[in-house]
Regions:
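Non-transmembrane, membrane-adjacent beta-strand/coil modules in membrane-associated proteins
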Residues: 84-125
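Juxtamembrane interface helix immediately N-terminal to a transmembrane segment
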Residues: 1-17
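Cytosolic juxtamembrane segments of membrane proteins
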Residues: 54-99
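Hydrophobic, membrane-inserted alpha-helices
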Residues: 16-26, 41-44
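A membrane-cytosol interface segment of integral membrane proteins
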Residues: 111-147
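Transmembrane helix interruption/hinge and helix-loop junction motifs
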Residues: 26-35
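N-terminal low-complexity, intrinsically disordered "leader/linker" segments enriched in small/polar
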Residues: 2-5, 55-59, 104
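Transmembrane-cytosolic junction motif
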Residues: 11, 36-68
């Protein structure tokens, strides 16, 4: 299953950009150059600062987490994404390596998309396609990532 993700604004992104713009407008009275610089930075942040993701055809805003780990985690992760109930400690796996796990998730909706890559010839190549996880399996993966 090929799922494309596009960057979108989150409410937090808009609030931060608005605060920087307002700080620029407010400081324009004291120092016009500083005010213009801050307001310009706020406008640029509004254009380019996007921390949320949306899957094609879905409305939920997702958060992205990427983790590099050793090759010994490849098969257990494939098994977990395939539906087997496996307990993994990904906290000690995050030391880097040739396997990359990218997870796009929305904890409130109990929805996650996982992509698993292997590193070879200086590029990441998909080890498995994008896998959509729901409810308990998504919740378990999100809790493993936060350990």
């Amino acid at each position: 299953m090929e799922t494309n993700f596009k960057s979108v604004h989150t409410p937090k992104d808009i609030i931060i950009s608005t605060i920087v713009i307002l700080a620029g407008v407010g400081s324009y009275v004291l120092n016009p150059a500083l005010g213009v610089t801050l307001a310009s930075c706020g406008l640029l942040m509004l254009c380019f600062f996007k921390k949320g993701y949306k899957a094609d055809g879905k409305e939920q805003v997702l958060t992205k987490v990427a983790m590099d780990m050793s090759a010994s985690y490849l098969q257990p992760l494939k098994d977990f994404l395939g539906g087997k109930s496996i307990d993994l400690n990904l906290g000690e796996a995050s030391k880097g390596g040739p396997v990359r796990l990218e997870v796009y998730f929305n904890q409130a909706a109990e929805l996650a998309y996982a992509q698993l890559y292997t590193f070879s010839n200086y590029t990441y190549e998909p080890a498995v396609g994008t896998i959509e996880l729901h409810s308990k399996q998504a919740e378990k993966l999100i809790s493993m990532l936060k350990k």
